[in-house]
Amino acid sequence: MTTQGGLVANRGRRFKWAIELSGPGGGSRGRSDRGSGQGDSLYPVGYLDKQVPDTSVQETDRILVEKRCWDIALGPLKQIPMNLFIMYMAGNTISIFPTMMVCMMAWRPIQALMAISATFKMLESSSQKFLQGLVYLIGNLMGLALAVYKCQSMGLLPTHASDWLAFIEPPERMEFSGGGLLL
């Protein structure tokens, strides 16, 4: 008796995934339950006779537009880690490769800032366009600041007094001294 009870309990657990399609407590309803009176033929699970209003499409489109606008706004900030890696790999020596890297690091943010009005037109459909535009602007300014810092660390910016010696007048001598002989 215990073995039969165990088998019945085991059988119930074993077919837990099965859907009971017949009977009044079943998972699916027949056409007779819907009032069509055509017998016991079954509809597929999840089928409805009524048309479901499609309001989720508009909400999904709005969410996708917001997500796309944030992707555009965060684009310059996503480039900063790669720029830091390129700065590290280029070194501080003045040669053609590091100079080209610095020029490209400076040119991309400048180009993006010159085309900022076209970018803001793409962000107009967003409800957070001001914040997204501000994030975009800050990201490009940070990229430009990294390029200026790299120029300074390479010694390309005139930040020391010795860089301006050509513009400084030589000091006037207050005294003249001669050799060690008296005449």
From Swiss-Prot:
Q: Which GO terms describe its cellular component?
A: EMC complex; endoplasmic reticulum membrane; membrane
Q: Which UniProt keywords apply?
A: Acetylation, Apoptosis, Endoplasmic reticulum, Membrane, Phosphoprotein, Transmembrane, Transmembrane helix
Q: What Pfam families has UniProt attached to this entry?
A: EMC4 (PF06417)
Major location category of this protein: endoplasmic reticulum
Where are the membrane-spanning stretches?
Answer: 67-87, 99-120, 128-148
* UniProt modified residues of type Phosphoserine: S36
Q: Where in the cell is it found?
A: Endoplasmic reticulum membrane
Question: Residue ranges, Cytoplasmic compartment?
Answer: 2-66, 121-127
Gene Ontology molecular functions: membrane insertase activity
Its BP terms in the Gene Ontology are: apoptotic process; protein insertion into ER membrane by stop-transfer membrane-anchor sequence; tail-anchored membrane protein insertion into ER membrane
InterPro entries in the record: TMEM85/Emc4
Q: So which stretches are on the Lumenal side?
A: 88-98, 149-183
| Record text on subunit structure and interactions | Component of the ER membrane protein complex (EMC).
What family does the entry list? Belongs to the EMC4 family.
Q: What is the role of this chain?
A: Part of the endoplasmic reticulum membrane protein complex (EMC) that enables the energy-independent insertion into endoplasmic reticulum membranes of newly synthesized membrane proteins. Preferentially accommodates proteins with transmembrane domains that are weakly hydrophobic or contain destabilizing features such as charged and aromatic residues. Involved in the cotranslational insertion of multi-pass membrane proteins in which stop-transfer membrane-anchor sequences become ER membrane spanning helices.
| Name of this protein | ER membrane protein complex subunit 4
